[in-house]
Amino acid sequence: MIQKHCFECGTALIEKELEEEGIVPYCPKCQQYRFPMYNVAVSMIVVDEETGKILLIQQYGKPSYILVAGYVNRGEAEEHAVVREVREEIGLEVKYLRFNRTKFFEPSNTLMCNFTAFVRTAKVLHINHEVDRCKWFTPQEARENIRPNSLAAEFLNAYLDEVGNKPMEM
């Protein structure tokens, strides 16, 4: 998604060279460069700290499993968004977390920040209205059940490749 108008005054942006940046959108009225705006979201590989199992969810009537994820609120740190989203969507408390990687997701104009969120398993999960179903998987089962060719699969597989299918060993 490319901005066409200034977010301050609404004037049509032009392309203008900026030293060491290349061509950047520019507002001739405000006389300011307008760098691209995008969303920021977090996705989490939720790991049971005792068993090493990974929680995957299904959402919005879709049959495929994905990672828990959500948008970062304005002014909110990504780490706080991880804790908030895990608590809101599945009712678990994050004991500790680990940053994994980021990747820009073009379809939603979103920078995705992936973390591993280690939790203590609750006997009953309290899923909210955003989650249809959730299930614990071994690392290998998680690889097999995550939505194929998705960013969630890319994050999960990269993480498991790094830790050798042993999520508790960092």
Model-assigned labels for residue ranges:
Residues E154, A158-M170:
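Charged phosphate-binding loop/patch that engages nucleotide di/tri-phosphates or the phosphate backbone
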Residues T11, G22-I23, P28-I54, Y71:
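Conserved N-terminal beta-strand and adjoining loop/helix that marks the start
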Residues H5, S43, K53, N114, ...:
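Conserved beta-strand and immediately adjacent loop positions that scaffold enzyme active sites
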Residues V72-L97, R101-F155:
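Unchanged
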Residues Q3-H5, V24:
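Residues immediately within or flanking Cys/His clusters that coordinate Zn2+
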Residues V47-E88:
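Conserved Nudix-box catalytic region and its N-terminal flanking loop in Nudix hydrolases
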Residues P36, S64, E106-N109:
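Short glycine/serine/proline-enriched coil/turn segments at secondary-structure junctions
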Residues C6-L18:
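Short, intrinsically disordered, charge-biased short linear motifs at domain edges
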